């Protein structure tokens, strides 16, 4: 599975291995609080991923079938709207394989970071206890997520998650691994704010901070879900 995480126009790709790692108790609780136990109710998720002043990408995803609909632009700025099954990715066009699907993986991690890290299973997760917040006042429990030094497009990437007493991420610091085939920030520091519930899912919709010292903002808009037994979209609120 290819995993991505972007803050600039460049795409930041997670390392990939299949070995599951033990999770500390705090991360296991976060996994539940962010919606794991009810994720099976989700039939469709719709959202727009935005990097302020740079781009917007709109997605509709059916988790049970892995059917994806994308609306946005390609790397040259041409409008694109298409639907494809991820189960048949190898037979898709170069546009889908090289641009659209990597963008989906990236944006979906921003949407469901805690769940994606847990499902993936390759990262080492460590509870480092209470630490000073990198941006705000006070302190929070620092949980470090580190990907393997080999394998994937961006090996060795590390995330420091600053988690409050409510098990919600408040801020994070990203350290780029430095190797791999994709360009990405060396240092990214940002908030994890504007939490909303979309059905059973807990989602942070606003991230403000700096990428390699430059002000940056990533935010999610128009988030909604359809759950089993309902034909109506439930807007995040």
Question: Where in the sequence are the language-model features?
Answer:
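Positively charged n-region of N-terminal signal peptides that target proteins for export
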Residues: 1-4
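Bacterial N-terminal signal peptides
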Residues: 6-15
